[in-house]
Amino acid sequence: MPVRRHILEDLHRSLGATFGEFAGWSVPMSYEGTLKEHMAVRREAGIFDISHMGRMIVSGEGATELLERIYTKRVSKTKVGFMSGPTLALNEYARVKDDEMPYRLGEEEWLIVPNAAVADAMLEYFSSIASSMGLNVSIRDLRERYALLALQGPGAARVMEEMGGGDLLDLKPLQFRENAGIAGVTAYIVSRSGWTGEDGFEIIAEVEAAKRIFKAAVEAGAKPAGIAARDTLRIEAGFVLGGHEYGEDPLRWPCAVSLRYGLGAIDWGKKGFVGEAALRACRREGVRWIRVGLVMKKKYARMIPRSGYRLYVDDVDVGWVTSGTFSPVIGRGVAQAYIDSRYAYIGDTIEVDVRGKRGEARLQEFPLVPLGSRG
């Protein structure tokens, strides 16, 4: 399959972006360097183009019923004008297809933003489940028409105000507004949300409007940031990514209970969703693997735990790294990992095999760094 191109690619090339492939897309990986972009988001503000992610509208009688069948959270409790917060779509083995945050546009109208690697598959999956339930809902793909931007950081509100979006500063977390004016254009949707652990806004706008907004954000002081920085930021924050922390194959991936997603992603009082029986069995029987955070100890600060590296306690192989990076915030290697539940004690020391050398790390809860404004 040919590599897909971002609908704002020309803009990013004009800003000096370097490109790489991610989930079948040619994406801006960085502009001035991942370290600078990462710290800009932690200290002030950065703006990302995340248009490689999915965007689809599910509407019509039965749309909410469809989402209740697919998701582990009771999304029907979500108020119009708000996102549901994170929830999971499972397969019948209680493995995770995707983690998503549906936007409720109306009583029977939702905006879904699947992760890039599964956007096409989720479009087909929604249609398949709707058909099996006998629901005549409309499912529309918006990716060709609308871009998706993320303005993130403790200074995101300042940048938004300078762009003329001051009336959006009263948005609560996970609240959104339709037809919002920014930078002299109208955005389809602006939400108070993000995936970096910082304050911020996610903006869905038609292509030309999105170009205007991106440029205006940069002029107001937001640093253009690439996908590489978005990944290091989400690792620090403890946010998951398909193909790293979860996947559908039961021979490779632990069940969703092991993910310890938190944030109310699973409503244990809910019944009737795909994968429910397997999920309850997994919880009842207990899990072998637990997702935890790792922070390298000071002596081993420059050792970076990468995906696939093995973990040891007294020479016993007890798990593996799912995602890792060097944290510029604390100056140490950090990671997310799965560890045998018998050894998953926060605060304990574990060894990471980094290219044949062992380094000590501390097991830590998420987030792995302090979040919010910092100097």
From Swiss-Prot:
The gene is gcvT. Pfam families: GCV_T, GCV_T_C. It catalyses: N(6)-[(R)-S(8)-aminomethyldihydrolipoyl]-L-lysyl-[protein] + (6S)-5,6,7,8-tetrahydrofolate = N(6)-[(R)-dihydrolipoyl]-L-lysyl-[protein] + (6R)-5,10-methylene-5,6,7,8-tetrahydrofolate + NH4(+). HAMAP family: GcvT. The glycine cleavage system is composed of four proteins: P, T, L and H. Belongs to the GcvT family. This is Probable aminomethyltransferase. GO terms for cellular component: glycine cleavage complex. The glycine cleavage system catalyzes the degradation of glycine. One of its GO terms (molecular function) is aminomethyltransferase activity. Its EC number is 2.1.2.10. Keywords: Aminotransferase, Transferase. The keyword Protease does not apply. InterPro entries: GCS_T (IPR006223), GCS_T_bac (IPR022903), GCST_C (IPR013977), GCV_T_N (IPR006222), GcvT/YgfZ/DmdA (IPR028896), GcvT/YgfZ_C (IPR029043), TrmE/GcvT_dom1 (IPR027266). The keyword Transferase applies. GO terms for biological process: glycine decarboxylation via glycine cleavage system.
